[in-house]
Amino acid sequence: MAPNIRKSHPLLKMINNSLIDLPSPSNISAWWNFGSLLGICLITQILTGLLLATHYTADTHLAFSSVSHICRDVQYGWLIRNLHANGASFFFICIYLHIGRGLYYGSYLYKETWNIGIILLLTLMATAFVGYVLPWGQMSFWGATVITNLLSAIPYIGQALVEWAWGGFSVDNPTLTRFFALHFLLPFLIVSLSIIHLTFLHESGSNNPLGIISQSDKIPFHPYFTTKDMLGFTLMFFPLLTLAFFFPNFLGDPENFTPANPLITPPHIKPEWYFLFAYAILRSIPNKLGGVLALTASVLILFLSPLLHASKMRSLTFRPMSQLLFWLLIANLLILTWIGSQPVEDPFIIIGQVASFTYFFTLLFLFPITATLENKILY
């Protein structure tokens, strides 16, 4: 019998083992769709980004006008720009749900995959931040000023670091140029990290909703999960296109319709919605260095998840007490997101401080304590 080229060709064999004949647990739910959705988000962002980069000018005098030119004069430029801006929001929605799935079902016990995933999240956050500066509107400029200025809280080398990042003594043309270079470069780093992420995942195989070994019940990835992923793509593109066509500025900030002006500070400087939870944690501590440390810890705390796992069961499926705690954590993050969008005044200050404390306390203490308690009850 003639050898199947899909299984014998060196390149096709890799694709086959990753996307076609990959043995997958038979019971993985829709929560396992977000990996492929993140892949399609990344491809969409790179394609729309490349098209935008061909018309964009990374110069403080021309950046704002060039974005306006893209939307007015370039064929379907308005659509490409709207897809790129709102695609970033969907990227973050998918990655947050993907991380939430990992926390709920204990996927973080695949330590290598989990750690690369967190590095991916940090790279994505960096990419989104430098990208937000490029239109050179008011919120772009002041967001860049405020966030990069946080580096000055680092003892001894802080001020030098800020001036090095800015390329001068304030956010200006050198800053915009290097941010454009970084925004162009980082997505390709995300692609390579994603390949490493998948390599580690395929070493162990996927987890499943029951959190049990599924070696005895695997099915091929194609056609079952390729079809399921296609449905996921459709369900994601529908709201993305609805947003891009009908409500393109719904998630944006009105301040960004005003060209950057170093002499006028907007009344409320705030980042895009997907950073608001971390911004609320930053603002909840009335000390600059403390705030920066809390901001960093709010994401880096995810590295501790495998170390803090105290339960004898992997998933939360059969652990109602931990489930309640998990949903309280989600509610807490939503409160932080809301607080991040509010001005710094009572009662928002105290709500933010309580929510920030609860966030760290839940992850560091309540989850391990509850898991130990459940072990006592169940075993």
Curated annotation (Swiss-Prot):
Heme b b566 binds at H98, H197. Its cofactor is heme b. It is a multi-pass membrane protein. One of its GO terms (biological process) is mitochondrial electron transport, ubiquinol to cytochrome c. Binds 2 heme b groups non-covalently. It is found in: Mitochondrion inner membrane. A ubiquinone binds at H202. The chain crosses the membrane at residues 34-54, 78-99, 114-134, 179-199, 227-247, 289-309, 321-341, 348-368. Heme 1 (or BL or b562) is low-potential and absorbs at about 562 nm, and heme 2 (or BH or b566) is high-potential and absorbs at about 566 nm. Belongs to the cytochrome b family. This is Cytochrome b. It comes from Tinamus major. The gene is MT-CYB.
